[in-house]
Each structure stands twice: as C-alpha cells, then as structure tokens.
C-alpha cells in the first residue's frame, strides 16, 4: 500500500499552529469579509455612500465571488502551492478592507467586494486540504471544527466589533477591519505547513466518485439554500416583522453569533464520535424543526434559543460535510477534488437562493415566516436525500 507524508502523525505541539492559521483564514475571508458587511448596510445607506439598491448589489458581489473562488482555488494552488495561495488570498481580503474605506464608485466597491469573495471561496477550498493532512485521523473532525470556528467568530464579531467602530465613522470602520485582517494575516503567515507530497497510486485518476459523494453534493447544496433566510432576514424579522425593534433584533443576532461560535467545534466533535453521516442526519433534523418553529415564534426566549440553534448551522455544517468527504473518499488527492466540487455546489445554491429569497420576500410583501418555512423544507429535503429513495434522486441532480 503506497504511503504519503500526509498520513504521518505530527507532534502535538506542531498541530495547533496550522489549525490556528486555518482559523485566521476562515475568520478573515468569510467571518469578517462576508458577515461584517451586514451591520454596515444601514450605515452605508445613511451616509449616502450608496443607494439601497446598490448596497444589496454590492452584497451579492461577495457571494458571486465566492463561487468564482471555489472554482479557481485548486488551479491557483497548483500554480502557487497551497501555502502561497492561502497567503495571497488573505492579502487580497486585507487589501479589500482598506480599499472599501474610500467610496470611489459603485464599480470600485463591486470589484473589491468581488475580490474578497473570490479569496473566501479559494480559501474555503484549500484550507482544510492544507491543514488536515498534518492532524491525526481520530482528531480530524475536531480540528476542522476549530479551523472553521473562524467563521463563527466573524459572525459574532459582526455584532460586537462593528458597532463600536461605526461610532468613529465608516472610513475608520473599514480601516479598523483592515488592520484586524492584516494582524491575523501576519499571525498566521508562518503557521501554514508545507504542502505534503500526495501519492495517488491507490486510486486511478479516472476512477468515478462513489455515488454517495454526489448524494453529499446535493445535500450540501440544499443545506446552503436552507441557511440563507435566517442568515439574511433574522434581524429584520425580529425588528420589523414582529415589531420588537432594532435593539431586540440586535440581541437575537448576538445569540445567533453565539451559536455560530459553538457550531463548528461541537459539530466536529459529533463527527469524531458518531460518524459524519449520523451527525448530518441529526443536525438536519434539528435544524428543520428549529426553522419551522422560528416561523411561528414570537417570545424573546424562544427566538433567542432558536437563534443559537440555527446560528450553529452555517459554520458548523462545513466540518461535518468535510468529514463526510473523508469517510467516502480515502485518497487524499481525490478528497481535495471532492471537497472542491462540494464547495462549488454549496456556493452555487447559496448565491441562487440569495437572489430567489430576496425576490420572494418582495413579491410576498415581506412575509418572513414563508421564507423560514421554505428553508425548513430545503433542510428536510437534504435530510431525505440521505435515505435510499433520496440517494437515487440526488445522483440525477448533480452527477455529471
């Protein structure tokens, strides 16, 4: 049996530096670059930097960029190496923060928001493939949870760091985010491990992926569609839909951020102890119920509890899906290929869902509950795909 340096056990003290670098990358590229934009939207409009329509358009630029980055990540790493590509993408995100401090034009902003999204997609494809080969097999789930904890920290930070920065003005806010991104880029710079030499003789290059992998692609796509409404409309639902006001909406968003911090590590822990497939089934069932209850809940305690549960899902499902890829595809090189395709599937449905839910929200006269029920249906469909009759359907959806 051929062996690879990717399978060698690293000393415990050396494991945490790459994991920390991965956490910094997910925090900068997704946690801050995407989620810190949400609380900036009202300020961008009130300061007359851009119109309301332009602000939504600029937000979509990041999602489109994420899809492009997911497609370009592996070719970029092939030319630059994983480590250099990750470093470059973190520099790009940092530059985007600084550039957004200057409202030159809508085109200027769109270009930088697009670039930050491209960097986020590329990092999401490459970060686990760079770090996890240096982690013992029994701890890969927990390690991937720690890496993607950065997304949760960014969601939480969007509700705690941005408001104080906004008191200094929009330019200072963007510059502050850029300074934080620059610091995290510097701290992670020497934490990235050297690329491992992959030996792929254990699997033929043209060997087809197992059918269960395409099933996972379909599941991951519908998970993406299911997480969008709460991620985008939760605060508006509480503040305007329920008439509770912006303050209560902000408090519920903080609880969502708390869930986002808890999610990655706890879901990774589940993957290590229950296996990825059972964990995905459990998580999807809980999420479908929580989203259904969100559509009919009105008390603060219920909303806060549901926000924690639902908030754990966007960053938490990443290590679970990655663990499932590792269960289904033993060869390290093919794991990278499968994860890249899964990320593209996720990014595509997330972008499409974002536009579709926005259109439906406008067409329904701002009916938040309808969006949450549809998202619960998407999560339930993802769960159904994991059963025999669903597996046949999923292979028809995404198999080339």
Sequence positions of predicted segments:
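Cytoplasmic helix-loop-helix junction between adjacent transmembrane helices
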Residues: 112-150
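Helix-loop-helix hairpin linking two adjacent transmembrane segments in secondary transporters
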Residues: 137-138, 145-192
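Extracytoplasmic gate region of multi-pass secondary transporters
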Residues: 38, 213-254, 261-264
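A membrane-interface helix-boundary motif in multi-pass transporters
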Residues: 164-179, 359-379
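Intracellular juxtamembrane helix-capping segments at the cytosolic ends
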Residues: 122-135, 316-330
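Paired small-residue
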Residues: 107-116, 301-309
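A late C-terminal transmembrane helix in Major Facilitator Superfamily
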Residues: 332-364
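Helix-breaking motifs and short loop linkers at transmembrane-helix boundaries and internal kinks
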Residues: 49, 81, 102-108, 243, ...
């Amino acid at each position: 049996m051929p062996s690879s340096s990717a399978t060698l056990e690293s000393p415990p003290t050396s494991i945490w530096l790459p994991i920390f670098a991965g956490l910094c990358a997910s925090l900068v590229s997704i946690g801050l670059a995407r989620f810190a934009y949400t609380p900036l939207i009202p300020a961008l409009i009130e300061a007359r930097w851009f119109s309301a329509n332009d602000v939504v358009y600029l937000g979509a630029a990041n999602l489109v960029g994420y899809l492009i980055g997911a497609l370009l990540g592996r070719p970029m790493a092939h030319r630059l190496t994983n480590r250099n590509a990750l470093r470059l993408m973190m520099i790009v995100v940092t530059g985007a923060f600084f550039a957004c401090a200057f409202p030159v034009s809508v085109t200027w902003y769109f270009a930088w928001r697009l670039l930050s999204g491209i960097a986020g997609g590329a990092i999401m494809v490459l970060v686990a493939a760079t770090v996890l080969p240096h982690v013992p097999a029994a701890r890969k789930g927990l390690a991937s949870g720690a890496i993607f904890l950065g997304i949760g920290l960014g969601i939480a930070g969007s509700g705690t760091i941005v408001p104080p920065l906004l008191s200094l003005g929009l330019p200072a806010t963007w510059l502050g985010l850029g300074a934080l991104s620059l610091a995290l880029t510097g701290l992670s710079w020497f934490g990235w491990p050297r690329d491992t030499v992959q030996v792929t003789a254990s699997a033929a290059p043209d060997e087809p992926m197992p059918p269960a992998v395409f099933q996972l692609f379909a599941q991951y796509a519908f998970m993406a569609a299911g997480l969008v409404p709460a991620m985008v409309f939760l605060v508006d639902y509480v503040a305007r839909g329920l008439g509770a006001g912006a303050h209560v909406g902000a408090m519920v968003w903080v609880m969502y951020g708390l869930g986002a911090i808890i999610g990655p590590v706890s879901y990774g822990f589940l993957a290590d102890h229950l296996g990825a497939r059972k964990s995905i089934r459990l998580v999807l069932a809980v999420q479908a119920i929580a989203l259904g209850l969100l559509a009919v809940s009105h008390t603060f305690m219920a909303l806060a509890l549901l926000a924690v549960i639902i908030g754990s899902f966007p960053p938490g499902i990443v290590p679970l899906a990655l663990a499932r890829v590792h269960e289904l595809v033993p060869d390290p090189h093919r794991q990278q290929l499968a994860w890249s395709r899964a990320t593209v599937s996720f990014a595509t449905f997330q972008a499409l869902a974002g536009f579709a839910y926005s259109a439906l929200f406008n067409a329904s006269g701002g009916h938040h509950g309808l969006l949450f029920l549809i998202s619960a249906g998407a999560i339930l469909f993802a769960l159904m795909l994991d059963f025999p009759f669903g597996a046949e359907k999923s292979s028809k959806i995404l198999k080339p």
